[in-house]
């Protein structure tokens, strides 16, 4: 084992670029000193010819006389110097000769595959082998030969793989010792043979290895039945793979390609350091073994080949009809190549050169390809820059007669632009070809962004990107921003001239800059001039109320903050007059209420709500008493005033903090004690003084009054009686009493009876109408289509009826505050409302049916409620907030979409119609970018994919039925025509969206998910055309006639072919040939990632929008 104190250096290098792993066939183990001299430090070098072998590195180990692989596999990287002699290599150098003896190997690190072996002996060995390795075929006879260097009167012993094999008496030993092996077999004869004198140390032995192919000569394979190729120039057929293992200096399928002097490796890309390869032993994978480089021979490869011989170990004889014999190449003839001049030369031809556009400061990678006979070698192809600097290739790959060299230039500058040359040099000629390198400067805006609007939590900025310096086109626009007091920048990618920054801090200054990017790596330019803008002040919490819940609890509530106000709340509460009872609570931004518990009964508490955004402002507060734990006291300070002949005013005081909810007055005539009248009056929470006017009293009559109060614990004791004496009858009163008492009683009696009758009739009608509506909803929800085609269980197996299993979130009528009408049709209406749900206030869109809506309209409306309940939440489907029934009408509250429906949103983006000056100034036909339009389409596809997975059919998919919510997310809405089956056949004809309907729906009233895909294709056309009317100018009758004949919507002028191809796939006549929504989503996702302009919104000459025909849309 190579210990740390015996190794001066153990270095490992790997090429860390992406690529395939190193193969053992690409590895060469170089042994510079098989016989170790005391004068030199022994070493080994393992080289891989695969320079693109990312992550896989080489490891060296020892196998004989002791397996010591783990330490030799350790190492560190070479220092990165240019040029490196071998881009992927491992080397080891010993400081002690005693450890540099035995059999060593090289393999791929962490691999259990094949190894490449070499051997080292000490110079004091008494014998030397004829060669380090001997390769024979199965069944052949061979002599393992050694030469004696030192004489000793002792017997010799031969060990094989460390075990005794043979010994010779001293009398039989000559200067050349032969150990014969007959009928060689791999399993019994292959191995390491070491010879020494019997008394000598094992480390003084001479080593050679016998490699026995498992097949007879000329064959390979598991059964040795496959014929080997004719391996030329000393190549050996691999008995496992059938490949020719080529000697160093040759390559090709049959080793017929000559590399020349000083080259080695699988592709002849490696060069010896001195260019000569003298005194180096090259070892390859079995069954080749070890040999000298081409042109050299001997155990240490120090001897040149004699005349007439060439190749590795000088084993090949020149047979040259013409020309001369070169010991490195074989026969050398003018105009021909090959070891026997069997191939005619052809001039190299450079191909695949392309002009290059690159951004300044990035690395340029250029491939130069040249073909010829013989194919150019690594180093034959060079790159010459525009300023005549020559650059060497970092790697070369050769396939057949074509070689491709890879060049890399760090940090290209503008001065490097111009005509570059790819040059090929060989022994006979030089050819070159030119290409253009354009170096672009990334763009930088010249003006800062401009503020267009602001709020407490947002800024709306005009990017102001033109004019800019540098080169276009502009690929992406990024807005950089940070608080003025911070150091870290945030960024958002812009998809139009305006950018809205949300979730900002109120009353904060923000530093903003615009950064432009052009296509390609390094295309991001420097940020433009900075501008500082401030967000606005947030409004304080409003509607703060504190109310009693129990004797020990209060409820504090306030109106929920606007959507963009995300500040937290701090609530401080204390008992009145007791500062030591202060309690503080921290609440999140979506809070609008909190319960206070563990309080004292009959105590007053004060609470203040502070907003984290309203620093330095006065904050609202409220106070309330907890409910009482005892009966209330009777009213106090009772007084009577403003007495007349028929009336009087009664005032009294209510005790504070006693939770009094009602006050009761009982009064009677003094002379008629059996007739008593009683009045109950509600007491407001903070009301301490009360007033009541007694009317209809008798003149000149005495009355006795008593009062008491009621709270959560019960009634108080009665107050002491209070006397009242009315004044004598006035003259006008007497006259009226004499002549009008009877008439008054008749009028009052008749009016009372009439009111009672009307009230009773109204209650009966209301109850009947409510029962009728409930029965209608239940019957609608239970109604099933006439024909089903579904993989789900048949209808009679369904558990109960739909209406009984339907559970929807209920809203209270008192929790809905209507604000405005958002839209209405012939039979329905949508209103904007503010609702309270789960203690929180939020915006909502509330839908209701009009009085004269038909049975079908009510069925579709109730069906929409059922579909939304069964679908559940999804980010691309409008969310159901709740439902409410009031006076026999059903109200449906859904998520409020601030940007309206997609169709109107697209048409509003037609800026050439709404703001021509802006359109011309910014050369755009729409405020929406290609990315935004594709994002809308992807959102709808994602929602429809979820809908189809739930086995629901929409039946009315169109841009008008898609809403644009917060952050411009598209959400599918209007499920009034949806059904929960895979196939639905409509049994009646109603209003039909003909322009969006599939052929099978028009002809046979069949609706499936595939028909929804057709409708999606039309929706995609609407998005690309910015809200155009499908088949504008055509009637529905013409559509019925032309669609079955193959007529389809024309491609919009601003539409990419790939997007229109997706539309056409959706409009295929056979439903099963149309793509699924998941496939559509996959295609759109890929388009979004590529950031290509699939929908061109640039304003070009004679630009026209797709036509809009509202009357045609209403007709279908």
Curated annotation (Swiss-Prot):
The keyword Kinase applies. Its main location: membrane. It is a single-pass type I membrane protein. It is an enzyme of class 2 (transferase). It is found in: Cell membrane; Cell junction; Cell junction, Focal adhesion; Cytoplasm, Cytoskeleton. Pfam families: fn3, I-set, Ig_Tie2_1, PK_Tyr_Ser-Thr. It comes from Danio rerio (Zebrafish). Its EC number is 2.7.10.1. This is Angiopoietin-1 receptor. The gene is tek.
């Amino acid at each position: 084992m190579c210990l740390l104190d015996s190794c001066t250096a153990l270095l490992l290098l790997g090429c860390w670029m992406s690529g395939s792993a190193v193969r053992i066939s690409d590895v060469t183990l170089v042994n510079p000193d098989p016989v170790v001299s005391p004068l030199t430090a022994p070493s080994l070098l393992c080289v891989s010819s695969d320079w693109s072998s990312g992550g896989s590195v080489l490891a060296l180990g020892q196998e004989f006389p002791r397996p010591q692989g783990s330490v030799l596999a350790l190492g560190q990287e070479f220092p990165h110097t240019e040029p490196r002699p071998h881009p992927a290599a491992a080397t080891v150098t010993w400081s002690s000769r005693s450890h540099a003896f035995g059999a060593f190997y090289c393999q791929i690190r962490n691999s259990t595959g094949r190894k490449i072996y070499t051997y080292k002996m000490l110079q004091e060995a008494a014998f030397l082998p004829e060669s380090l390795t001997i390769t024979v075929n199965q069944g052949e006879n061979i002599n393992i030969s050694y030469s004696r260097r030192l004489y000793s009167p002792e017997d010799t012993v031969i060990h094989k793989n460390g075990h005794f094999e043979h010994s010779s008496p001293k009398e039989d030993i000559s200067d050349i010792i032969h150990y014969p092996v007959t009928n060689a077999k791999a399993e019994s004869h292959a191995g390491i043979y070491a010879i020494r004198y019997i008394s000598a140390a094992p480390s003084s032995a001479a080593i050679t290895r016998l490699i026995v192919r498992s097949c007879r000569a000329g064959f390979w394979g598991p059964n040795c039945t496959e014929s080997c190729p004719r391996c030329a120039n000393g190549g050996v057929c691999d008995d496992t793979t059938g490949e020719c293992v080529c000697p160093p200096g040759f390559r090709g399928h049959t080793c017929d390609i000559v590399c020349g002097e000083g080259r080695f490796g699988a592709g002849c890309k490696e060069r010896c350091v001195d260019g000569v390869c003298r005194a180096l032993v090259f070892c390859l994978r079995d069954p080749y073994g070890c040999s000298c480089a081409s042109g050299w021979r001997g155990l240490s490869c120090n001897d040149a080949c004699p005349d007439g011989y060439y190749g590795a170990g000088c084993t090949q004889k020149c047979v040259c009809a013409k020309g001369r014999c070169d010991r490195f190449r074989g026969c050398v003839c003018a105009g021909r190549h090959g070891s026997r001049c069997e191939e005619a030369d052809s001039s190299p031809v450079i191909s695949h050169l392309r002009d290059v556009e690159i951004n300044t400061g990035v690395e340029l990678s250029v491939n130069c390809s040249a073909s010829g006979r013989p194919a150019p070698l690594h180093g034959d192809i060079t790159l010459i820059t525009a300023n005549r600097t020559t650059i060497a290739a970092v790697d070369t790959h050769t396939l057949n007669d074509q070689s491709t060299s890879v060049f890399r230039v760090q940090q290209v500058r503008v001065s490097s632009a111009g005509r570059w040359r790819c040059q090929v040099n060989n022994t006979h000629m030089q050819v070159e070809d030119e290409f253009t390198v354009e170096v672009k400067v990334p763009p930088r805006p010249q003006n800062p962004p401009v503020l267009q609007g602001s709020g407490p939590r947002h800024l709306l900025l005009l990017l102001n990107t033109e004019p800019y310096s540098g080169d276009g086109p502009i690929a992406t626009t990024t807005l950089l921003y940070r608080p003025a007091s911070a150091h870290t920048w945030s960024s958002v990618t812009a998809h139009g001239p305006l950018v809205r920054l949300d979730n900002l801090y109120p009353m904060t200054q923000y530093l903003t800059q615009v950064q432009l990017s052009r296509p390609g790596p390094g295309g991001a330019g420097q940020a433009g001039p900075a501008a500082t803008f401030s967000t606005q002040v947030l409004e304080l919490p409003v509607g703060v109320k504190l109310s009693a819940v129990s004797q020990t609890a209060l409820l504090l509530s306030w109106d929920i903050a606007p959507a963009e106000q995300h500040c937290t709340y701090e609530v401080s509460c204390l008992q009145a007059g007791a500062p030591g009872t202060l309690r503080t609570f921290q609440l999140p931004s979506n809070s609008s209420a909190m319960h206070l518990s563990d309080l004292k009964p009959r105590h007053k508490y004060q609470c203040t709500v502070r907003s984290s955004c309203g620093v330095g402002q006065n904050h609202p507060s409220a106070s309330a008493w907890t409910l009482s734990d005892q009966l209330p006291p009777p009213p106090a300070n009772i007084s009577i005033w403003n007495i007349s002949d028929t009336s009087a005013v009664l005032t009294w005081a209510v005790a504070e903090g006693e939770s009094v909810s009602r006050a009761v007055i009982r009064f009677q005539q003094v002379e008629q004690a059996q007739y008593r009248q009683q009045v109950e009056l509600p007491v407001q929470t903070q009301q301490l003084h009360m007033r009541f006017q007694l009317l209809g009293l008798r003149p000149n009559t005495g009355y006795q009054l008593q009062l008491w109060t009621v709270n959560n614990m019960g009634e108080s004791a009665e107050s002491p009686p209070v006397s009242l004496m009315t004044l004598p009858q006035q003259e006008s009163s007497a006259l009226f009493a004499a002549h009008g008492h009877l008439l008054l009683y008749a009028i009052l009696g008749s009016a009372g009876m009439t009111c009672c009758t009307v009230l009773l009739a109204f209650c009966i009608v209301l109850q009947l109408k409510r029962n009728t509506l409930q029965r209608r909803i239940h019957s609608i929800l239970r109604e099933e289509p006439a024909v089903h085609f579904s993989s789900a269980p048949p209808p009679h197996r369904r558990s109960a009826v739909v209406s009984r299993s339907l559970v929807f979130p209920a809203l209270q009528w008192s929790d809905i505050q209507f604000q405005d009408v958002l839209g209405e049709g012939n039979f329905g209406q949508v209103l904007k409302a503010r609702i309270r749900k789960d203690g929180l206030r939020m915006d909502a869109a509330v839908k209701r049916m009009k009085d004269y809506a038909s049975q079908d309209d009510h069925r579709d409306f109730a069906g929409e409620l059922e579909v939304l309940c069964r679908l559940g939440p999804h980010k691309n489907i409008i969310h159901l907030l709740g439902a409410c029934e009031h006076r026999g009408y059903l109200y449906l509250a859904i998520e409020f979409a601030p940007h309206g429906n997609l169709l109107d949103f697209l048409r509003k983006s037609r800026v050439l119609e709404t703001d021509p000056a802006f359109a011309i100034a910014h050369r755009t036909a729409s405020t929406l970018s290609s990315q935004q339009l594709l994002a809308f389409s992807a959102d709808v596809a994602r929602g429809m994919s979820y809908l189809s997975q739930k086995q629901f059919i929409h039946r009315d998919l169109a841009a008008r039925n898609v809403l644009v919510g917060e952050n411009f997310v598209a959400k599918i809405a209007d499920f009034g025509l949806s059904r929960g089956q895979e196939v639905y056949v409509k049994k009646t004809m109603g209003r039909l969206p003909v322009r969006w309907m599939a052929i099978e729906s028009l002809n046979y009233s069949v609706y499936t998910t595939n028909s929804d895909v057709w409708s999606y294709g039309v929706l995609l056309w609407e998005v690309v055309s910015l809200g155009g009317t499908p088949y504008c100018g055509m009637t529905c009758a013409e559509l019925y006639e032309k669609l079955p004949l193959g007529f389809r919507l024309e491609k919009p002028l601003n539409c990419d072919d790939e997007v229109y191809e997706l539309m056409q796939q959706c409009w295929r006549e056979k439903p099963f040939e149309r793509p699924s929504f998941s496939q559509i989503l996959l295609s759109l996702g890929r388009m979004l990632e590529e950031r290509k302009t699939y929908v061109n919104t640039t304003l070009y000459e004679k630009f026209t929008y797709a036509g809009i025909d509202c009357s045609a849309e209403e007709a279908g």
